[in-house]
């Protein structure tokens, strides 16, 4: 179980 996807952080 990798868990929920992480939010995309802008560069």
Curated annotation (Swiss-Prot):
Keywords of this entry:
Hypotensive agent, Metalloenzyme inhibitor, Metalloprotease inhibitor, Protease inhibitor, Pyrrolidone carboxylic acid, Secreted, Toxin
GO CC, alphabetical: extracellular region
Tissues expressed in: Expressed by the venom gland.
| GO molecular function terms noted in the UniProt entry | peptidase inhibitor activity; toxin activity
A single Gene Ontology biological process assigned to it is: regulation of blood pressure
Where mainly located? secreted
The Pyrrolidone carboxylic acid modification is found at 1
**Annotated compartments:** Secreted
Residues making up the signal peptide according to the UniProt record: none
Q: Which family does it belong to?
A: Belongs to the bradykinin-potentiating peptide family.
Function of the protein: This peptide both inhibits the activity of the angiotensin-converting enzyme (ACE) and enhances the action of bradykinin by inhibiting the peptidases that inactivate it. It acts as an indirect hypotensive agent.
Name this protein carries in UniProt = Bradykinin-potentiating peptide S4,1,2
Q: Which organism is it from?
A: Bothrops insularis
């Amino acid at each position: 179980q990798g868990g929920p996807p992480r939010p995309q952080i802008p560069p």
